[in-house]
Amino acid sequence: ENFSGGCVAGYMRTPDGRCKPTFYQ
């Protein structure tokens, strides 16, 4: 799933190219 190189709203892209929820910080 590629959203212009980004992720779904509320998610961030990790260095390995995956997406993680920003609230896991």
Curated annotation (Swiss-Prot):
The keyword Transferase does not apply. Pfam families: GBP_PSP. The keyword Disulfide bond applies. It comes from the Eukaryota. Belongs to the GBP/PSP1/paralytic peptide family. GO terms for molecular function: cytokine activity. The lineage of its organism: Eukaryota, Metazoa, Ecdysozoa, Arthropoda, Hexapoda. Biogenic peptide that prevents, in lepidopteran, the onset of metamorphosis from larva to pupa. This growth-blocking peptide has repressive activity against juvenile hormone esterase. One of its GO terms (cellular component) is extracellular space. It comes from Cotesia kariyai. The modification Glutamine amide is found at Q25. Transmembrane segments: none annotated. This is Growth-blocking peptide. Disulfide bonds join C7-C19. Hemolymph. InterPro entries: GBP_PSP (IPR003463).
